[in-house]
Amino acid sequence: MIKNIVFDFGGVIVDIDRDKAVQAFIKLGLADADTRLDKYHQTGIFQELEEGKLSADEFRKQLGDLCGRELTMEETKQAWLGFFNEVDLRKLDYILGLRKSYHVYLLSNTNPFVMSWACSPEFSSEGKPLNDYCDKLYLSYQLGHTKPAPEIFDFMIKDSHVIPSETLFVDDGSSNIHIGKELGFETFQPENGADWRQELTVILNS
């Protein structure tokens, strides 16, 4: 029986628009943004930021070096937010409803620029931060690992005391779903942009 649900952030709770993000970073001056940005797993300084190896300010400085000019923290943040489309309140309300019957967690490859927005009242039109929708957030840059590394899953399992066989892992990334299955989680892989609420309800009721 499912007792816990672990959601991914980008591509599940909030839809991702990689092309918009690429254009935002090109506008900053990063001419090769298209080769540096990935929907599922970053590389270079982008990966180092998500793994917590670079602080937000260190990333800003190194990105500025690549762009050939000094960038502000706000400019850098807005470029990162280019990844995300408008937050769908229907999904957020659905997740709130799930919390009446399940423990709800977030496991995300992310960074402090994105989370400074997501964990603020600006996140939703109702003025609620992401924290209000989950029991706990497990964020790659705070934990020093990114999915699909087993270490980030292991930390979440030990910290939350979830039993994988009693936990549904919801993620749009194939490699993340693969490791989730290997670790014993029940899994569900919706497509980025999909309204997965009805399908998830069927899974939980089966």
From Swiss-Prot:
Single GO biological process annotation from the record: dephosphorylation
Reaction catalyzed: D-ribitol 1-phosphate + H2O = ribitol + phosphate; D-ribitol 5-phosphate + H2O = ribitol + phosphate; 5-amino-6-(5-phospho-D-ribitylamino)uracil + H2O = 5-amino-6-(D-ribitylamino)uracil + phosphate
Names of required cofactors: Mg(2+)
Molecular function as annotated in GO: 5-amino-6-(5-phosphoribitylamino)uracil phosphatase activity; metal ion binding; ribitol-5-phosphatase activity
Matching InterPro entries: HAD-like_sf, HAD-SF_hydro_IA, HAD_sf, PGP-like_dom2
UniProt-listed Pfam families: Hydrolase
EC code: 3.1.3.-, 3.1.3.104
PANTHER family in UniProt: ALPHA-D-GLUCOSE 1-PHOSPHATE PHOSPHATASE (PTHR43611), FLAVIN MONONUCLEOTIDE HYDROLASE 1, CHLOROPLATIC (PTHR43611:SF3)
Protein name: D-ribitol-5-phosphate phosphatase
Organism the protein comes from: Bacteroides thetaiotaomicron (strain ATCC 29148 / DSM 2079 / JCM 5827 / CCUG 10774 / NCTC 10582 / VPI-5482 / E50)
